[in-house]
């Protein structure tokens, strides 16, 4: 077996047998990794605590045939501010859940890793009204799943009349096509900033009804792609 070291964010864990856990992680070089942490449920140790979801750690693993084996985990950032605040915890769990469910296994994607780490660090410093939606829209862009915002996805019409957004269709639709929900011009602009990575412009905006519109559309788009609800987003009031 090959021994390797990797900076990872823990996405999710599962019980395995009487004492072990399967750890799903997203690595800077390897992308999604699944590995077994042996004996972590037998006693409360720092090793086990470092392998909880929303932990940024440096792991050492043996490469396995089906599952790798975690032999060591050193903390980089455990995000106590996120884990100690219910609202921030809900958002942090949503960030890792979406990667766990949406991003395919295999192959490195450093841009996704960097996006996740930066979003968690910003959330640790203090919540911003547009942080979660900015993260979700940018993730969709990086994954090649961003919506079409400048023309009708059904017929290609541009300009006036594009006042409806359809998550199912994948973007804006004109009045000639049914379905979708009304969307404001301001929301279209903000979503465009987020998809293109101009999160600073969005994060500086004050909280308002626009935030609910932009976030609600992001969640609809994500949940439509997953064909299920994002569990973490429904732990509390949305």
Which role fits each region the language model picked out?
Residues 1-22, 26-238:
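Non-catalytic alpha-helical scaffolds and adjoining flexible linkers that form interface surfaces
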């Amino acid at each position: 077996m090959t021994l390797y070291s990797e900076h990872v964010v823990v996405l999710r864990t599962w019980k395995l047998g009487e004492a072990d856990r399967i750890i799903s992680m997203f690595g800077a070089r390897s992308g999604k990794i699944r590995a077994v942490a042996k004996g972590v449920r037998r006693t409360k140790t720092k090793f086990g605590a470092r392998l909880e979801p929303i932990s940024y750690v440096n792991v050492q693993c043996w490469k396995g045939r089906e599952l790798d084996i975690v032999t060591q985990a050193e903390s980089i950032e455990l995000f106590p501010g996120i884990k100690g605040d219910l609202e921030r915890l809900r958002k942090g769990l949503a960030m890792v859940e979406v990667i766990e469910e949406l991003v395919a296994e295999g192959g490195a994607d450093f841009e996704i890793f960097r996006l996740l780490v930066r979003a968690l660090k910003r959330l640790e410093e203090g919540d911003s009204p547009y942080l979660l939606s900015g993260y979700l829209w940018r993730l969709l862009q990086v994954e090649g799943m961003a919506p079409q915002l400048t023309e009708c996805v059904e017929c290609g019409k541009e300009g006036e009349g594009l006042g409806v957004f359809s998550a199912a269709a994948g973007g804006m639709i004109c009045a000639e096509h049914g379905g979708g929900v009304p969307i404001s011009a301001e929301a279209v602009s903000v979503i465009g900033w987020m998809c293109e990575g101009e999160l600073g412009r969005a994060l500086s905006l004050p909280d308002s009804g626009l935030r609910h519109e932009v976030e609600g559309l992001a969640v609809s788009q994500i949940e439509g792609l997953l064909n299920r609800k994002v569990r973490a987003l429904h732990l509390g009031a949305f």
